[in-house]
Structures are given as C-alpha cells and as structure tokens.
Amino acid sequence: MFAVNYIKNSCCANHAICTKKENLIIENTEITNYLNSISYSDTLPFIPPIDFGKVIKVYDGDTITIAAKLPNTLGPIYRFSVRLLGIDSPEIKGSTFKEKELAIISRNILSQHIMGKIVYLRNVSMEKYGRILADVYLGDLHVNDWMIKNGYAIPYDGGTKHRPSAWDNDSV
C-alpha cells in the first residue's frame, strides 16, 4: 500500500495516465520487484542507531522504554523497548507470588533511578523478541551493573535462565 500511495502522491500527481489502476499496479510491481528473490537468510536485523533517549516507561527490572529520534533527522520521536544487557530480574508475570513481589520491588527501584531521565546506550544490538539490547548508562553509572550489585537482578548471558531459589519461595 505504501508503494501505491507513494506513486500516486509523488510520482504520478500530475499525470492523468497514472490515475488508472492498471498503471498503478505496473508501477507498484517495478518498485517491489527486487523483493521477489529475497529470503530471510538474505536479510539483516534492523538495529536502530540509537545512542540515548529519555526513559518513559520502566516495565520491570531489566526492560525499559525510551523515547528518541533517529539520528540526523527532524522526524518523529519514536519509542524503543530496551532490555538491559547481561542481567535478568524477577518477572512481573512470574510463576510465584514471591517472584512477582520481587519484580515490583526491582521495577520500582529502577524507576526511581532512571524514570524521566536521559540514558545512554552502549553495546547496542537486538534480542530475540525484537527489543534493543544494550548497556544502559545514567551519566557514569552503569545501570545494568548497579542492578546486579544491589541485588535487584542477577547476571544473565542470554542463554538458559537460572532463577534463584529465593524467587520460588512463596513465604513472605
């Protein structure tokens, strides 16, 4: 649909012949023809070139949302979901009451430190769920390490998660 609208609005605006549906289909085919031979293995993941942004949401102790523009653009401000690299925190939708309780504590502590502030991203990549994966800094403070050192998260290498037994304890 984008290609058709682009042709109609940009390429053909002053040409009566382009207003016919068959001409739009021909133009659309020419624009998208290169896609016919593309497969998944021919493509690369898109890693947004984001270096910093304002924290607008803290989902849990290892996932935040930032607002940022793409560099060198006047364009819109986008929101990006960012997973803190190298850490795992209790899950808000965890399997035990204790894990959910710890997740709220972890989220609230992280939120108190970074919500509404400008953070810087380093070692940016994409993770399997489509989120940005990055080291997050607030000034000189490496937020990821701070969460681990203060007991609100555990180290995580991206493989199998190893939940501490304390997350499974339902006693309060």
Regions of interest found by a model, annotated:
Residues 1-172:
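Small beta-barrel nucleic-acid-binding modules, primarily SNase/OB-fold domains
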